[in-house]
Amino acid sequence: MKRGSFLVLAAVLMVFAYLVYYSFSSPYTVTSDDAKRLLREKKVDVVLDVRTKMEYNLGHYPEALHIPTANLAYTAETLIPNKKTSILVYCNTGQRARYATELLVAKGYTNVKYIAGSYLTLTR
């Protein structure tokens, strides 16, 4: 029984490690320090908040464009018509931002990055 429990625990830990690695390994990922630098150097045209309206209302990056992930597929091209626009995407954990970034890239946007982690790191 102990051996079986150990194998299950080991398998769960391996899956967890893979998911963490996958979450933060993308050519579109930037660290909070890199994001701050891009913003400071004015290399970002649009800061995109993909959280829910309630999350956005609780606090957001100044001048962030708010498009919840659920609405992004059908509103992005209207609200951000130039597909060469430099876009920095954020959410609370990086998961929705990653999804949103992949969606934007699939729609033809060529200069999209997302913050691996919480947007709160931008304000510190």
Regions found by a protein language model. Give the residues of each.
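Extracytoplasmic/periplasmic/luminal assembly and interaction segments
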Residues: K53-T93
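Extracytoplasmic/secreted envelope proteins and their assembly/folding machinery
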Residues: S32, K36, T69, A73, ...
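Structural motif
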Residues: L39-R40, Y56-G59, L79, L104-K107
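Flexible, polar/low-complexity N-terminal or interdomain linker segments that lie immediately upstream
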Residues: M1-V46, V50-L58
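Catalytic cysteine-centered active loop of the rhodanese-like fold, especially the PTP/DSP P-loop
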Residues: A76-T123
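Conserved beta-strand scaffold positions in the cores of enzyme catalytic domains, especially
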Residues: V47, A64-H66, V112-Y114
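A broad detector of short, well-ordered amphipathic alpha-helices
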Residues: D33, P62, Q95-R98
